[in-house]
Design a protein with these regions (language model features):
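Acidic, metal-coordinating catalytic segment for phosphate/diphosphate chemistry
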Residues: 14
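Intrinsically disordered, low-complexity regulatory regions enriched in serine/threonine/proline
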Residues: 1-9, 21-172
Length: 172
């Protein structure tokens, strides 16, 4: 569902900046030539979602320059939020916190089976992001359901033009 929504919401913005969609079934991957290489953008889902279903999952958007027009290409790169200004990162934090506020209480059965350290780490997923994100923070877009994804895919297309300007400056 993440890739489908990403393709619909972000595809027009990428196309307007000269990116073509990579013909990968059900994957949100775009590329454009950059001299003898390619700039590639893709949506990457976490490999470690919440196994207990409380706080959900997350995704990022990666940008890299490399020899091949495919997701995971080796080369210099950045993640979406590294390319935002302070205002853009604040908008991301606002959505992140809105999603966190909507979380239900953590499941008691899960809390009972975790040791103190694991419980603290688990509960941290339900705490608001109180400090402003910095340009070097590794920010993942959290989601539990379609409503959360809709919130992200309302915001991300608004931020995409500025991000793609930064991609052109930094990666070509």
């Amino acid at each position: 569902m993440v890739h489908r929504k990403a393709l619909a919401a972000l595809g027009p913005g990428f196309a307007a900046r000269g990116f073509a969609r990579r013909p990968a079934p059900a994957a949100a991957v775009w590329h454009r030539p950059a001299a003898a290489e390619f700039v590639v953008a893709w949506v990457q889902l976490t490999r470690s979602p919440d196994a207990f279903g409380w706080y959900g999952s997350r995704f990022i958007i990666e940008f890299r320059r490399g020899a091949e027009p495919r997701a995971g290409v080796l080369g210099p790169g950045f993640r979406f939020c590294q390319l935002l200004d302070d205002g853009g990162r604040e908008r991301v934090r606002a959505v992140q916190n809105a999603l966190i506020r909507r979380l239900p209480p953590p499941p008691a059965r899960v809390l009972r089976m975790l040791d103190d350290h694991a419980r603290e780490c688990y509960l941290a997923q339900g705490r608001q992001v109180t400090a402003a994100y910095g340009p070097d923070d590794d920010i993942w877009f959290r989601h539990r359901d379609e409503r959360d994804l809709d919130a992200w895919f309302r915001l991300l297309p608004v931020l995409l033009p500025g991000v793609l300007d930064a991609v052109r400056r930094r990666l070509g």
